[in-house]
Design a protein with these regions (language model features):
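Solvent-exposed, well-ordered loop and adjacent helix/strand elements within mature globular domains
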Residues: 59-65, 70, 78, 82-178
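Positively charged n-region of N-terminal signal peptides that target proteins for export
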Residues: 1-4
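SH3-family beta-barrel domains
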Residues: 8-33, 47-50, 58-60, 81-92
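Short, solvent-exposed loop/turn positions at domain surfaces
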Residues: 39-42, 118-119
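Residue-level recognition of short, solvent-exposed, well-ordered loop/turn junctions
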Residues: 43-52, 125
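Core beta-strand residues in small-molecule sensory/regulatory alpha/beta domains
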Residues: 35-37
């Protein structure tokens, strides 16, 4: 362990990196483009996931709010934060995630379901907001079959074919703290 720290410090000093790089986290639900240059018109190298931890090499004011990231590339400062967004949430575990389509009826809470917003869940109160890994933020508005248990939610996708394509998946789920 000590050898790794010493080697990392030596490599960092050779490359001009500080031993204690500033850390930031992706705070964009739909991911964040890591760009070749500090501009929105620059090519995207890859898409970073919500909550991904990044080490900052440079946050010079001349970059106009962009950060140069260890490993190469730039991220727009509008879509990052200095605290881990998952520290502001309660991890509920790995849940079974199924999907449902339009029925023509309102949800159990009286609202009509909305794609990208509504989930059905029996173990959480109406209005509870959750973050589902790889999906994003959703809100409990409906209920589903009791036999599916507590570690389950049903994503409203609207179209039957989208639900069939989704199938039955397992994802990590966090409850957003109030």
């Amino acid at each position: 362990m000590i050898r790794r720290v010493v080697v990392a410090a030596l490599i960092g000093s050779i490359l001009g990196l500080s031993a204690q790089a500033e850390v930031i986290y992706v705070n964009s639900e739909n991911g964040l483009n890591l760009r070749l240059k500090p501009t929105e018109n620059s090519a995207s190298i890859q898409v970073l996931e919500f909550g991904q931890k990044l080490a900052v090499i440079d946050d010079d004011p001349d970059l106009g709010g962009w950060y140069r990231i260890e490993g190469g590339g730039y991220v727009d400062g509008k879509y990052v934060q200095k605290t881990d967004p998952f520290s502001e949430m309660e991890f509920l575990g790995e849940w079974r995630i199924t999907a449902y389509a339009e029925t023509g009826y309102p949800c159990a809470n009286g609202n009509y379901p909305t794609v990208g917003y509504t989930i059905a869940c029996n173990s959480l109160d109406f209005g509870t907001e959750v973050y589902i890994e790889g999906i994003g933020f959703r809100t409990v508005e409906d209920r589903g079959p009791a036999y599916l248990g507590d570690a389950w939610c049903d994503l409203y996708l609207g179209e039957f074919n989208a639900c069939v394509a989704w199938g039955d998946q397992t994802k990590k789920v966090w409850r957003v703290k109030e």
